[in-house]
């Protein structure tokens, strides 16, 4: 797109969700945005399921989830949405896997995960669902990799990740699944690893240069970006506290190395717990938490062509801890926390896509 900066983007505001929530699970299927589970005002996981018809801009209530949960993963398989893992009302990870049949408007239980887990990362490839890592009921990070075969309704084990973690960022590129970051307890993970789907082997890549919690990650044009977050103090710096940063680190998949961009190419705002995505040749960073007493509403983009950060139109509703989903020219920002769990549903769009 030839327009620069904010001229290339606009916000599209959708009707608010009937149910306010944070840590909801989201999916997009055939013109419908599904929002499943999450935590409501009481702080407990929900079984509520709702869908937004993108054409009519109307919300419909769906049959409730058989298992109330928050922080689950979701994968679209044709006319089905598979919901995997998460945490239940007693804050315990669950093994439940359930599928919503779009054409029939009902849920079906599927083969459970071999181990209960929250913070599972999922990737779909050729109709198979890969579930990586997670945190079990004992709070230990998991290294397990499982693949779900829908025709047989079963999970099979694959070679474990070299580094156990939960809440990692995953990217499918070629025949490889890239796994970046995540956490082990309260500690952020710097590992960057790739699973070859054909050879079924793991490769360790150089670790992230800096240790940051609640960073944002994206992949675009053969590079992986790690942005912002809470910088963790070094092992010998006992008096330092975590602090918000605007760090930008970039991994070149072809050359196999990280570059920490100079101060002049850092984000404009220091932020953590924000939404990040790739739209029209830009890496975009949306909302989150910073040094201010309330969530950020600022939005910025890094132009891959011009190699600079530019301010974009601010969020209509400033929030952090949002669910997000990219569908075509739209990056949806759903729910999250404003002054409490939010009902807001907004999408940052390329102007040609509004």
From Swiss-Prot:
The record's keywords, sorted A to Z, are: Cell cycle, Cell division, Chromosomal rearrangement, Cytoplasm, Kelch repeat, Repeat
At the top level of its lineage, which domain of life is listed?
Answer: Eukaryota
Q: Tell me the GO BP annotations in alphabetical order.
A: mitotic cytokinetic process; mitotic nuclear division; nuclear chromosome segregation
Q: Name one GO cellular component term.
A: intercellular bridge
**Main localization of the protein?**
cytoplasm
Checking Gene3D superfamilies in the record gives: Kelch-type beta propeller (2.120.10.80)
SMART domains per record: Kelch
Family annotation (InterPro entries):
Kelch-typ_b-propeller, Kelch_1, Kelch_domain_containing_8
Q: Membrane: present as a keyword of the record?
A: no
Signal peptide residue numbers: none
Q: Where is the protein localized?
A: Cytoplasm; Midbody
Query: Which regions does the record annotate with the repeat Kelch?
Result: 1-31, 32-79, 81-127, 128-175, 176-222, 224-281, 282-329, 331-354
- Disease linkage: Lymphoma, Hodgkin, classic: A malignant disease characterized by progressive enlargement of the lymph nodes, spleen and general lymphoid tissue, and the presence of large, usually multinucleate, cells (Reed-Sternberg cells). Reed-Sternberg cells compose only 1-2% of the total tumor cell mass. The remainder is composed of a variety of reactive, mixed inflammatory cells consisting of lymphocytes, plasma cells, neutrophils, eosinophils and histiocytes.
Q: What does this protein do?
A: Involved in pinching off the separated nuclei at the cleavage furrow and in cytokinesis. Required for mitotic integrity and maintenance of chromosomal stability. Protects cells against mitotic errors, centrosomal amplification, micronucleus formation and aneuploidy. Plays a key role of midbody function involving abscission of the daughter cells during cytokinesis and appropriate chromosomal and nuclear segregation into the daughter cells.
Q: What is this protein called?
A: Kelch domain-containing protein 8B
- Source species, please? Homo sapiens (Human)
């Amino acid at each position: 797109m030839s327009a620069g900066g904010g001229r290339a983007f606009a916000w599209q505001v959708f009707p608010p969700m009937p149910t306010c929530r944070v840590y909801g699970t989201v999916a997009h299927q055939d013109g419908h945005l599904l929002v499943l589970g999450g935590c409501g005002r009481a702080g407990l996981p929900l079984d509520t399921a709702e869908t937004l018809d993108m054409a009519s801009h109307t919300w419909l209530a769906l049959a409730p989830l058989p298992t109330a949960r928050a922080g689950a993963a979701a994968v679209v398989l044709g006319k089905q949405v598979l919901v995997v893992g998460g945490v239940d009302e007693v804050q315990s990870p669950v093994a439940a896997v359930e599928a919503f049949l779009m054409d029939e408007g009902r849920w079906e239980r599927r083969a459970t995960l071999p181990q209960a887990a929250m913070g599972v990362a999922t990737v779909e490839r050729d109709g198979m669902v890969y579930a990586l890592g997670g945190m079990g009921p004992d709070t230990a990070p998991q290294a397990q990799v499982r693949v779900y075969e829908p025709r047989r309704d079963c999970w099979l084990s694959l070679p474990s990740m070299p580094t156990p973690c939960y809440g990692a960022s995953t990217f499918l590129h070629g025949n490889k699944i890239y796994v970046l970051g995540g956490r082990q307890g309260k500690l952020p993970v710097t590992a960057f690893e790739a699973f070859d789907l054909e050879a079924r082997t793991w490769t360790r890549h150089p670790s992230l240069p800096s240790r940051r919690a609640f960073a944002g990650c994206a992949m675009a044009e053969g590079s992986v970006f790690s942005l912002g977050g809470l910088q963790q103090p070094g092992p010998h710096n006992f008096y330092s506290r975590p602090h918000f940063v605007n760090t930008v680190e970039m991994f070149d998949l072809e050359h196999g190395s990280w570059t920490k961009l100079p101060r002049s190419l850092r984000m404009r705002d220091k932020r953590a717990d924000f939404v990040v995505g790739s739209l029209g040749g830009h890496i975009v960073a949306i909302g989150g938490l910073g040094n201010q007493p309330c969530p950020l509403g600022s939005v910025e983009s890094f132009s891959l062509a011009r190699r600079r950060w530019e301010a974009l139109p601010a969020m209509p509703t400033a929030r952090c801890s949002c669910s997000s989903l990219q569908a075509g020219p739209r990056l949806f920002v759903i729910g999250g926390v404003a002054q409490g769990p939010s009902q807001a549903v907004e999408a940052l769009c390329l102007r040609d896509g509004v």
